[in-house]
Design a protein with these regions (language model features):
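Soluble, non-transmembrane alpha-helical interaction regions
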Residues: 21-349
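N-terminal secretory signal peptides that target proteins for export/translocation
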Residues: 1-3
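Bacterial N-terminal signal peptides
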Residues: 5-15
Length: 349
């Protein structure tokens, strides 16, 4: 076994820094690569959902403070300020919880992949992280070992989760700043400078709060189902590649798993827009888009890159939200399973 392992590493060393063909089969113990990929995929879905929930826990409360709490300028302590002070305490704990979740994701990757030699984490015929070396370099991390791979994965997931949340809740960065909740210099949440104010009409404020909550729930739900379904498909294909390479029966079985997974994703996509409609139907969209409302117009530049040139109706926003979540879901899979594109092509996806 030692001799086989040494030959495997030598083969990998000769392959770097170029890309090793997937058919060359130089993995010392394919079971370990499958375990590694499974750990990353599991951690990916869990982390994104946890971070979305934590961001929601903080910003939803702050949003409720400014939109639904009656102000009283004559009171010694304005009720809105009292509400924000309470939320500041909650949000401080949220920031700590996010940092802990990021560390837990890093630890899960390390635990799941530490049995592999670093070359097998990198090589294109194994876990495949050399395939996204440039993307990681663009994030400021050069891939040399498992620690750098974990750093790249977690960093990308941190940003991707924040971008998802910002599309659901454009004022998120502003609301975090309102209670001094600092996610650090690398945060991808943007403060669009809304001033921290809510609308004057408390009835409208409650309607906006309901709409906002519904959008966040719908967006997170779609992302969660997409990540889980894609992970099931890619895991099945990767197991065939590593444990039963060239086995047509294995691929045929994986194909069925993938067909079911993509069917689930398509079904969830169809639910997204009606869910937004249900939550936001009572809101006049013209009252939702200003900065003191839901600030949807702050997404115009990003939506334009997704083929939505303006946001003047709820339909424009829903289309942008879906396309953004679809794209980021694909991006998350690329960083969780760099070989996903190659594997999916084997079953026509």
């Amino acid at each position: 076994m030692r001799i086989a392992w040494i030959f495997a590493l030598l083969a990998g060393a000769l392959a770097l820094p170029g890309t090793t063909g997937a058919a060359e089969r130089f993995v010392a113990d394919p079971r370990l690569t499958v375990d590694c990929e499974a750990a990353i995929l599991k951690g990916s879905g869990a982390f994104v959902q946890q971070k979305l929930k934590l961001l929601d826990k903080c910003t939803a409360g702050v949003f409720k403070c400014i939109q639904t709490t009656p102000p009283d300028d004559d009171a010694e302590d304005d009720p809105v300020d009292v509400c924000l002070e309470k939320m500041a305490e909650r949000c401080a704990k949220t920031v700590e919880a996010i940092a802990a979740a990021e560390q837990a994701f890093t630890d899960a990757i390390t635990k799941g992949c530490s049995a592999l030699h670093p070359l097998e984490v990198l090589r294109a015929d194994a876990v495949g992280y050399e395939l996204i070396a440039q993307q990681c370099s663009d994030l400021g991390t050069d891939l040399t070992d498992l620690a750098s791979v974990a750093q790249c994965i977690v960093q990308e997931h941190e940003c991707a989760a924040e971008r998802l949340f910002q599309a659901e809740h454009p004022r998120a960065g502003e609301l975090l700043g309102l209670v001094d909740a600092d996610l650090g210099p690398d945060s991808c949440l943007e403060d669009f400078g809304g001033g921290g104010f809510g609308v004057d009409d408390l009835v409208l404020g409650k309607q906006l709060d309901r709409c906002d909550a519904g959008v966040r729930k719908a967006g997170a739900g779609f992302t969660g189902k997409k990540q889980k379904s894609l992970a099931q498909c890619v895991s099945a294909l990767y197991a065939c590649d590593q444990l039963a390479f060239g086995n047509a029966e294995c691929v045929a079985k994986a194909q069925k798993t993938c067909d079911k997974a993509f069917g689930t994703i398509a079904g969830e996509a169809l639910k997204l827009e009606p869910s937004v409609d249900k939550s936001c139907a009572v809101v006049d969209f013209s009252q939702a888009v200003p900065d003191e409302g839901l600030a949807f117009t702050e997404l115009v530049d990003e939506c334009d890159t997704l083929g939505v040139s303006d946001i003047v109706t709820i339909d424009h926003y829903k289309t942008c939200l879906y396309r953004q979540h679809e794209c980021i879901g694909d991006e998350l899979m690329q960083f969780a399973a760099p070989r996903a594109t190659e594997l999916l092509m084997r079953v026509g996806r």
